């Protein structure tokens, strides 16, 4: 069994118990890793504190970081470094788009809505990687959550699909840029999961049903399955893997 004792990871993007990032946290926790969590708003901190009761973490390392603020990202990671020292990796599961930009026609996306989705869902990985690098002097791993809508046009995914496409390109360029520092950057393309974010996608139940009917495994995946792949990518088991996008979607990406 993989042992991640003496490893420290920052997890970004837990909103509630259904969050993909919480599935990642549960797996890393079971493997013995020390976990550091970031959140955006105070209500998210309260939710995190409740969820921590389900984990085996001896201390609660919680930091408020709004990724739309350079200052908060810079200061947040600086404080993490002061409190816990160097880290071994980051799991980035942050994305946002306005509801109207997900439900309407893509061609009607506003400039403001387009840029907002890009800023939170893609650029945030760039600045997070820049600051996290300072805490990984001997190398490490950064993993981001994406979705098939970044590779293909998926009905009702709209502006978020474009943001995920940007995120996936971001992963590749960060992998190239940070490779000499022995920092690997990868993505996990997770199948549709009932998360808080998924509520904004129109026809989500239809998407879930299509996976059950057409995917090779004939079922949908869950947060913990994504967490298992994240553990692989964040650990030394994947030491030769970077710039990759691994699909955890019951094989749906492989069929027509």
UniProtKB/Swiss-Prot annotation:
Active site: 147, 157
Residues where substrate binds: 97
EC id: 1.3.1.39
InterPro entries listed in its UniProt record: Enoyl-ACP_Rdtase_NADH (IPR014358), NAD(P)-bd_dom_sf (IPR036291), SDR_fam (IPR002347)
Catalytic reaction(s) noted: a 2,3-saturated acyl-[ACP] + NADP(+) = a (2E)-enoyl-[ACP] + NADPH + H(+)
Enzyme class: oxidoreductase
Assembly, per entry: Homotetramer.
NCBIfam families recorded: PRK08594.1
Function per UniProt: Catalyzes the reduction of a carbon-carbon double bond in an enoyl moiety that is covalently linked to an acyl carrier protein (ACP). Involved in the elongation cycle of fatty acid which are used in the lipid metabolism.
Protein name stated in the entry: Enoyl-[acyl-carrier-protein] reductase [NADPH] FabI
Organism encoding this protein: Staphylococcus aureus (strain MRSA252)
Designated gene of the protein: fabI
């Amino acid at each position: 069994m993989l042992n991640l004792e003496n490893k420290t990871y920052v997890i970004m993007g837990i909103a509630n118990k259904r969050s993909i990032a919480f599935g990642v946290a549960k797996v890393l926790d079971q493997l013995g890793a020390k976990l550091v969590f970031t959140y955006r708003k105070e209500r998210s901190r309260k939710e995190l504190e409740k969820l921590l009761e389900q984990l085996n973490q001896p201390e609660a390392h919680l930091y408020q970081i709004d990724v739309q603020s350079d200052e908060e990202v810079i200061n947040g990671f600086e404080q993490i470094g002061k409190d816990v020292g160097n880290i071994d990796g980051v799991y980035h599961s942050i994305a946002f788009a306005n509801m109207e930009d997900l439900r309407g026609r893509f061609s009607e996306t506003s400039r403001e809505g387009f840029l907002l989705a890009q800023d939170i869902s893609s650029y945030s990985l760039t600045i997070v990687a820049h600051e996290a690098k300072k805490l990984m002097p001997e190398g490490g791993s950064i993993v981001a959550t994406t979705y098939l809508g970044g590779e293909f046009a998926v009905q009702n995914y709209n502006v978020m699909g474009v943001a995920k496409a940007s995120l996936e390109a971001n992963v590749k360029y960060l992998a190239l840029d940070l490779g000499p520092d022995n920092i690997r950057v990868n993505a996990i393309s997770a199948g549709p999961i009932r998360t808080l974010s998924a509520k904004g996608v129109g026809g989500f139940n239809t998407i879930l049903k299509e996976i059950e009917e057409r995917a090779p495994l004939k079922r949908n995946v869950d947060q913990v399955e994504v967490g298992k792949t994240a553990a692989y990518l964040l650990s030394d088991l994947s030491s030769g893997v970077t710039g990759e996008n691994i699909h955890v979607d019951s094989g749906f990406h492989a069929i027509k």
